[in-house]
Amino acid sequence: METLFDKFKIPDYFTIGGQEYKVVQKEVVRDENDDPVFGLHSPAEATITIAHKFPITDSSKHNFTKDQIVNSFFHEMFHSFNFMMNNEQEEVIAQSFANFMCEFLKTARYDSEYEGRESSRPFDQEY
């Protein structure tokens, strides 16, 4: 059975607390120290940048799975939520919520009366 996770697509833009964010997906993402990272949240630039690969050596890169890429997006998105609430960047909160969100999208089920409804996006169904 196809899940919400299977249907989920990372957006190019979204708005949180009145601030529009741009989402950039790149092969490799590096932080301010030039270290490779899974993703970055920049409240000053209102951007989230997500990596698709992680350098192992100078000539070898690990390809992230969809699970890793989507989890990284949610992790950085939850940084934007937390920043809007209290101007902090708590890693443990962002990662916990990202894990919960991915689990939710993978396990959400619908009663049989809603099965078979077609939608291009999982959240725009009419009831």
What is each stretch, according to the model?
Residues M1-D67, M84-Y127:
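Metalloprotease/metallohydrolase-associated module, dominated by Zn2+-dependent proteases
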